[in-house]
Design a protein with these regions (language model features):
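N-terminal regions of proteins, emphasizing targeting and processing segments when present
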Residues: 5, 14-15
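Conserved N-terminal phosphate-binding loop of PLP-dependent enzymes in the Aspartate aminotransferase
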Residues: 15, 19-469
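Accessible peptide chain termini
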Residues: 1-2, 21
Length: 469
């Protein structure tokens, strides 16, 4: 492992089993019903707001993911600061979800708030650059090792633009992603592998083009499958997280990412690393922590402290393949950016966040807490003899209801247990803890405390005791 930031021990994983106990599924169902009643009883204002919202908002929320939380309705928030969220019923929560990484460095970090507030008074958007944009480009180049950068509004946009540039550079149309991935609402990446066929992701709206025309899908950690897929030399780009996170954490096997680099270079394929979630590995993301050499990097979510902003960077070689000239000299519609992209407010927030929030000091606080969170969960799993596991990537921790960590998306998807998942999340929610609703993921922020981690450890043990056979 290349340790760009020596204080980080990026990955933590232990498998300690003495014996297995069975979870009593009937007890889980009864406990879930009880927790559901308690939730509805203690959140009357959120319930009332949800009923009102359903009359004007599709699904009763401004974005459909917000109904993924446990309970009959989402909690409505009045404020969020640091590692705390307070709802309209006056209940306070320790937040380990942190906006599903958008607030990975805390809600409303002071430096970001000050910079954004000051910039709003000076002007929000002009479709002209500010000095902040220069600083941000230089800082991203320093951190991630790629020399040229552009700004986007979301990581979805950054991924979409990166794929467009890869197609321009290679003259190829297809892209390759990994089963179980998520790279935003990019049509080519909202796919899954079903009996060897590329299909639309379950639950997604139909894409405009058959995904088998645009996309190849292989399993993570399977170099032979990747080699077969790339060998026709018809793939413009491999888009991937260096460790999968959106179906739970899946770590790369030893030598796997080196193999990906070798195969993409050999076949003339652009290697794009999506660091949006794996930025948890260190100030320069997984790329710098492990000394990776991608052709492009995309990132978003926490880069502006939670304000809509993202970025993508490219190598000198890719820049010189007419891409740089195309961007520098072409005006009008080239398929990259939008009217509000690179606005002054976003760049001011990005600069403040990069300079004063996403710092080495922050990781020195976050990573040890993640290690403790991971150890507490694994300790409980061991003590109760459950066939579960916990895994850590930097400041991110995940636990699953399966004995061994999955090696790919198919194994991760097969390990899902919706009943247990909903029970654990609702049990936590009723006791003042927010986990990421899509899976059992927790993030530590610079504001997270040891007391917060201890609270989760105790509640986690209590939740297990109530459902043992």
């Amino acid at each position: 492992m290349h340790a760009q930031f020596g204080f980080l021990f990026v990955i933590g994983l232990r498998l300690r089993r003495t014996h297995n106990l069975e979870i009593n599924r009937s007890k889980v169902e009864l406990a879930l019903e009880r927790e559901g009643r308690e939730f509805s009883k203690t959140h009357p204002r959120s319930k009332k707001m949800f009923e009102r919202a359903r009359k004007s908002m599709i699904g009763g929320v401004p974005m459909n993911w917000m109904v993924e939380w446990p309970g009959a309705f989402p909690i409505f928030v009045t404020r969020a600061r640091g590692s705390r969220v307070v709802d309209v019923d006056g209940r306070s929560y320790v937040d380990f979800c942190l906006g599903d990484t958008g607030a990975m460095f805390g809600h409303g970090p002071e430096a970001t708030v000050r910079a954004a507030t000051a910039q709003m008074r000076r002007g929000i958007t002009t479709m002209l650059p500010t000095e902040d944009s220069i600083w941000v480009g230089e800082e991203l180049a320093r951190r991630f090792g790629l020399p040229y950068w552009q700004v986007a509004m979301t990581a979805t946009d950054a991924n979409r633009f990166a794929l467009r540039m890869a197609r321009e550079a290679t003259g190829r149309r297809k892209v390759l992603v990994f089963n179980g991935c998520y790279h935003g609402t990019v049509d080519e990446a909202l796919v899954r592998l079903v009996d060897g066929r590329v299909m639309p992701r379950e639950g997604s709206m139909p894409p405009p083009v058959d995904p088998e025309v645009t996309t190849k899908v292989v399993e993570f950690n399977h170099l032979a499958a990747l080699e077969t897929a790339l060998s026709p030399r018809d793939v413009a780009a491999v888009l991937m997280e260096p460790a999968m996170t959106n179906c739970g954490i899946i770590l790369a096997s030893d030598g796997y990412l080196d193999g990906v680099r070798e195969l993409t270079q050999r076949t003339g394929t652009v290697w794009i690393i999506d660091e949006t979630h794996t930025w948890c590995a260190g100030p320069g993301g997984y790329t710098r922590a492990y000394g990776l050499k991608p052709d492009m990097i995309t990132l978003g979510k926490p880069v502006a402290g939670g304000l809509p902003a993202a970025a993508f960077g490219l190598s000198q070689e890719l820049y010189e393949k007419n891409i740089g000239n195309m961007l520098a000299e072409t005006t009008g519609v080239n398929g990259l950016g939008g009217t509000l992209t690179g606005n002054a407010l976003a760049l001011a927030a990005m600069r403040a966040t990069l300079e004063k929030v996403i710092t080495a000091k922050a990781y020195r606080h976050m990573v040890p807490l993640a290690k403790k969170f991971d150890a507490d969960v694994e300790g409980a799993i061991h003590d109760y003899g459950l066939p579960w596991h916990s895994i850590r990537l930097g400041s991110r921790v995940e636990y699953r209801f399966r004995a061994a960590p999955p090696r790919n998306g198919t194994e991760a998807i097969a390990a899902k247990d919706p009943l247990l998942n909903k029970y654990v999340h609702l049990y936590d929610l009723n006791r003042g803890i927010l986990l990421t609703p899509f899976h059992n993921m927790a993030l530590m922020s610079p504001y997270t405390t040891r007391k917060d981690v201890d609270l989760h450890a105790n509640v986690f043990r209590d939740s297990i005791q109530e459902i043992l056979g």
